[in-house]
């Protein structure tokens, strides 16, 4: 099966954009790792948000075929992990698009979670919610992601999360905020209720439905079982998992975290050895930082070819120029450490985002997963299938890659 060149190009463009400040504060990571254990268990998580959690409507706008309600509420995340969210993200904001007429006595609602870069409501309202009003008389509730739109920190550039911990905060917050909105919709007499999302939004919707204590229709589009992208079983990957599970409470034992944080500040895009020794030496001073989904999907094949090239030419370098060989050996060691650090991060990300680490939805037969056949942005090779994790769910495939499907095939998602 081929892969989309557009996806590969987009993935490369994402590099150096996200997680520019590294992992985040060690004390924040410790609290988030502990909190993940709570929301990974539906029996515990369902009691975190009460059925009467307060939700407020700020404005109602009448249109020809629908009403648009704007509302807000305090993110439950702020209660359970205080001061972990930026002040701009504490207030959760949403838009509720309701048809003026229903097709039956039921009032169905679908909650749409935002994909990467989907700020505010325009895209989901225009491409999903308004057509669903016309086609099915179905209401849509659009929740704004933490770190996006009105909830974006002032010092954040566009969608570029500054820390790895920000992604974990976003995921935990969306799980609890979705629960608050589902409770509110039930109180208001709406139903049946369902959830969907595209790309990152689909993954977040999957985590939210996993924690809802009732059967819930779910349509995750262009997402898969984990945010880590490429599944690996190396020691560094396992170390990343164990790091989360047994994160120490002692600050003086965080050397591994600090080491990886420093290592991730190496330039992962500089994978070609300069012919000038001075350039080899100075390359260690370059700075990029690990990146979000782009980093998680970083192909390690180039690194392997790089190491193979060094190994093949070892004797030639040694005999002709011992000093150059010494510098290249240092570069090779640095690249090896860089590679291990990236794999370590994938282990941490997998432990925190893999749906297998969350409860199985109450009724997986209500889940339809939509995938692109040529998706090179979220590859499925080597990753546990959602059909294996959620027995009974249905997988549907559409032609094309991740980006082309996201841009041009949203009608199929509806």
UniProtKB/Swiss-Prot annotation:
Residues with attached carbohydrate: 282, 307
A Pfam family the protein falls into: ABHD18
Compartment(s) where it occurs, according to its Swiss-Prot or TrEMBL record: Secreted
Main location: secreted
Keywords: Glycoprotein, Secreted, Signal
InterPro entries in UniProt: AB_hydrolase_fold, ABHD18
Position of the signal peptide: 1-24
Any one GO cellular component localisation term in the record: mitochondrion
Similarity remark: Belongs to the AB hydrolase superfamily.
Full protein name: Protein ABHD18
UniProt source species: Homo sapiens
């Amino acid at each position: 099966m081929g892969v989309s060149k557009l996806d590969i190009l987009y993935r490369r463009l994402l590099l150096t954009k996200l997680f520019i400040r590294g992992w985040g504060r060690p004390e924040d990571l410790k609290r988030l790792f502990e909190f993940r254990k709570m929301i990974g268990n539906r029996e515990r998580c369902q009691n975190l948000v009460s059925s009467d959690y307060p939700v407020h409507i700020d404005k109602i706008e009448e249109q020809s075929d629908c009403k648009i309600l704007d509302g807000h509420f305090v993110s439950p995340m702020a209660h359970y992990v205080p001061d972990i969210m930026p002040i701009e993200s504490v207030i959760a904001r949403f838009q509720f698009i309701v048809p003026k007429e229903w097709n039956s006595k039921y009032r169905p609602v679908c909650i749409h979670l935002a994909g990467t870069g989907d700020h505010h409501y325009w895209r989901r309202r225009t491409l999903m919610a308004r057509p669903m009003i016309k086609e099915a008389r179905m209401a849509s509730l659009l929740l704004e992601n933490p770190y996006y739109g009105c909830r974006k920190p002032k010092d954040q550039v566009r969608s570029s999360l500054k820390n790895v911990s920000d992604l974990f905060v976003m995921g935990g917050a969306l799980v609890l905020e979705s629960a608050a909105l589902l409770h509110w919709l039930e109180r208001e007499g709406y139903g049946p209720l369902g959830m969907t999302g595209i790309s990152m939004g689909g993954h977040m919707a999957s985590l939210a439905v996993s924690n809802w204590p009732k059967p819930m229709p779910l349509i995750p589009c262009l997402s898969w079982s984990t945010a880590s992208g490429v599944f690996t079983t190396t020691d560094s990957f396992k170390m990343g998992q164990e790091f989360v599970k047994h994160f120490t409470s002692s600050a003086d034992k965080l050397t591994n975290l600090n080491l990886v944080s420093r290592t991730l500040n190496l330039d992962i895009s500089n994978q070609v050895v300069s012919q000038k020794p001075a350039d080899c030496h100075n390359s260690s001073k370059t700075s990029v930082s690990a990146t979000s989904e782009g980093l998680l999907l970083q192909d390690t094949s180039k690194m392997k070819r790089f190491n193979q090239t060094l190994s093949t030419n070892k004797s030639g370098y040694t005999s002709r120029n011992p000093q150059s060989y010494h510098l290249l050996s240092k570069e090779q060691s640095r690249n090896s450490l860089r590679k291990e650090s990236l794999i370590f991060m994938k282990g941490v990300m997998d432990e925190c985002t893999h749906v297998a680490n969350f409860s199985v939805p109450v009724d997986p037969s209500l889940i339809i997963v939509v995938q692109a056949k040529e998706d090179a942005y979220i590859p499925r090779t080597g990753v546990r299938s959602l059909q294996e994790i959620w027995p009974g769910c249905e997988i549907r495939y559409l032609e094309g890659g991740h980006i082309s499907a996201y841009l041009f095939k949203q009608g199929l998602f509806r």
